[in-house]
Amino acid sequence: MGVLRYMKETGTTHEQLASVAVAQRKWSNKVPRAMMRDLITVDDVLNSRMICYPFHLLECCLVTDGGGALILTSAERANDFSKKPVYILGTGESVETPIVSQMYDMTYSTAFRVSSRQAFEEAGIKHKDVNHLMIYDAFAHLPIYGLEDLGFVKRGEAGAFIEEGNTSPGGKLPMDTSGGGLSYTHTGAYGMFLMQESIRQVRGEAAHQVPDVKVSFCQGVGGMFMAAGSLIFTNEPPHS
């Protein structure tokens, strides 16, 4: 209901919602590990089986097995490793309410807004400094909410922003470049894969690499979207 309310208030169309899945697939198309790689169109999405209105099958995350791991250590210790280290520039976390039914408004995520603001403040950077973005996408609306609640676009603008190709390969803000939960994988604890893709991008070793990524913003979500965590990664050592 929250998504339908958002669409009514902002004028976001079903075609724009479907564009999220189309954009993710353009990224996963060149990712060998991705579960779904064949390119799709908006019509393909809208003609796929309805799961729960307004979400069609291709607007819902995959169900897969999988796992991942990261090594977290000091910057000094990381210099001893064979691979170039990636640094955590900023962090943030927020829980709006313990029960999703108690959210003040389901047409946006207060937790997204709070956690991302904390991360930007800690990192000391602006939105224009971010080269790459990962937003948890269990369903197609979450990248739309994320773009707005993180402050990359204004409320009601995210659908058109994605539809116009701005988050797709060659766009001004590459997003969910592995294919995300809609096309790459979704094991239930998908946040691990968000972080891994951010790290691979800033290292320059991603399967579908974005040129010259120096800063990646990674946004996770929990409890529908009443809870959130934000991380900002960089390949340059933070100033002490």
Where in the sequence are the language-model features?
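Active-site pocket-lining segment
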Residues: 134-181
